[in-house]
Amino acid sequence: MAVTDKERKLAATLSDPVLWGQAYLYNRDGSGRDYWPHQVEDLRCPAKNIIHLDGRDVGKSIVLSTDALHYAFTTRGGQGLIAAPHQGHLDTIIEEIEFQLDSNPDLMNSIALTKYGKPKIHRKPYFRLEFTNGSVLYFRPAGAYGDAFRSLHVGRVWVDEGAWLTERAWKALRQCLKAGGTLRIYSTPNGLRDTTYYRLTSSEQFHVFRWPSWLNPLWTEDREAELLEFYGGRD
């Protein structure tokens, strides 16, 4: 049977996180989600290992949440971990993901149901989403030692504010990623050099993104001058 144009378009949308995000996700004002050029570059990057050195307000949380939702929505039986130094970092991402679920019935319908008909959105002891295709997204804070990571074995990991993970947490995190899995690390650098995060930013095994704050199309010269004065320069 010949593939219809509608089926061809759907296949293209599902295979591309940018097209998928534009089709399924929304901005807070209710308009359809769109992405800045630097966000598109990240979302379409095929590298297994990605690390960021980002400024403020460049939209990294939007990219992380888009990629995580796209992965879970389109990967049968996939398991992914969203990790961050502390629960407060995760709460921002969780809030964005819950907003998207509430905004699109098709997305909410992709969440599996309990035997009582309730969505499998678990909040205790840690936030977890289970999807009808068998995919699971885990959200875990690293804490000092990465104890919350130790029971997991996943195919994809997203790290928010990776510069602030402790060395022991990094070790625990690496052990929960399956061989051949994908690791995407997002962070604003903290200036510390004797760390796993800093070492990975110069590793040949990682594709490095550097996003200064002025990549944000809404950035202003006044805001740039303010931060340059505060930090003493661009470096």
Positions of predicted regions on the chain:
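Phosphate/NTP-binding elements of NTP-utilizing enzymes
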Residues: 2-235
